[in-house]
UniProtKB/Swiss-Prot annotation:
InterPro entries to which the protein is assigned, alphabetical: MTA_SAH_Nsdase, Nucleoside_phosphorylase_d, Nucleoside_phosphorylase_sf
Matching Pfam families: PNP_UDP_1
Group of enzyme by EC: hydrolase
E.C. code: 3.2.2.9
Annotated source species: Hydrogenovibrio crunogenus (strain DSM 25203 / XCL-2) (Thiomicrospira crunogena)
Keyword Hydrolase assigned: yes
Protein known as: 5'-methylthioadenosine/S-adenosylhomocysteine nucleosidase
UniProt pathway: Amino-acid biosynthesis; L-methionine biosynthesis via salvage pathway; S-methyl-5-thio-alpha-D-ribose 1-phosphate from S-methyl-5'-thioadenosine (hydrolase route): step 1/2
Top-level taxonomic group: Bacteria
Length: 232
C-alpha cells in the first residue's frame, strides 16, 4: 500500500516528514517529494505550496509518478460552522470551489464545467479518519463540505457572501478542491483532513499566525493515527 500525503506549507508537513523512515527526497517540476515509510506503510509526502494551481500540479505529478492507493490532503483551514473553534478537526465529505462561477451557462455555483458540482471523498478514508479521531483527546471534529478558493477569507462581506452560496460548508482553505479535482481525474481515492487555524471573518489573519502550529500538530497526529488504522 502507498499513501500520498499533501500539505501546502512547511509547518503542515514538517512533523510528518520527521516521522518518515528511510527518507529519500526526489525533485520533479520544482516540487520536493519525500519518500519512505511511516508505520511500515510506504508514503509520499509533498509540500505543494499555497493555492490551487500549485496543489493541482503537485498532485498530478505525484499520482502519475508514484501511483498512490490513497491521497490525504492535510494542513490548516478557516472554520465556517458556528460550532467549530480553533484547533478543531474537519473531515471532508465533499469538496468544491467557492470562487468558481459559471452559473449563467447553467452550472451550479462552484461547479467547473465538465465536472461534478462537488468531489466526494472516499467513504473508507472518511471512516478511517472518524475512527482515528479518538486519538486526539478533547478535540472536536466535524465532517461535511469543505470549499476552496484562491484567497484568504478575511473580509466579513466575503464570508457572508460565501456562506449565502454555500450554507452547508464547514470550512474554507486554498488547495483542497484542486487536490480533489485532480484525484477525480485520476480516479484516486482521497480525503481532506484539516485542523482550524482561524475562524473565517474573526481577525483571522492574526489568529492564523498564532495557531498555525497548533493546527498543524492536530492534523499531523490524526494522519499518523490514520496510517496505523490503514495498516491494520
Amino acid at each position: 500500500m502507498k499513501v500520498a500525503i499533501i500539505g501546502a506549507m512547511e509547518e503542515e508537513v514538517a512533523l510528518l516528514r520527521n516521522q518518515i523512515q528511510n527518507l529519500k527526497t526526489e525533485i520533479h517540476g520544482g516540487f520536493e517529494y519525500y519518500l519512505g515509510q511511516i508505520n511500515a506503510i510506504d508514503v509520499i509526502l509533498l509540500r505543494s505550496g499555497i493555492g490551487k494551481v500549485n496543489a493541482a500540479i503537485g498532485t498530478a505529478l505525484l499520482i502519475k509518478l508514484y501511483e498512490p492507493d490513497y491521497v490525504i490532503n492535510t494542513g490548516s483551514a478557516g472554520g465556517f460552522h458556528t460550532d467549530l473553534e480553533v484547533g478543531d478537526i474537519v473531515i471532508s465529505q465533499s469538496v468544491c470551489h467557492h470562487d468558481v462561477d459559471v452559473t449563467p451557462f447553467g452550472y451550479a455555483r462552484g461547479q467547473v464545467p465538465g465536472h461534478p458540482e462537488c468531489y466526494l471523498a472516499d467513504i473508507h478514508l472518511i471512516d478511517i479518519a472518524k475512527r482515528s479521531i479518538d486519538a486526539l483527546q478533547e478535540v472536536t471534529h466535524m465532517h461535511g463540505l469543505i470549499a476552496t478558493g484562491d484567497r484568504f477569507m478575511h473580509l466579513p462581506e466575503d464570508v457572508a457572501t460565501t456562506r449565502e452560496y454555500f450554507p452547508d460548508m464547514i470550512a474554507c482553505e486554498m488547495e483542497a478542491a484542486a487536490v480533489a479535482q485532480t484525484c477525480h481525474a485520476f480516479e484516486t481515492p482521497f480525503v481532506i483532513i484539516r485542523s482550524l487555524s482561524d475562524i473565517a471573518g474573526k481577525e483571522n489573519a492574526v489568529t492564523f499566525e498564532q495557531y498555525l502550529d497548533k493546527a498543524a500538530t492536530h492534523s499531523a497526529r490524526l494522519i499518523l493515527e490514520m496510517l496505523t488504522h490503514l495498516k491494520s
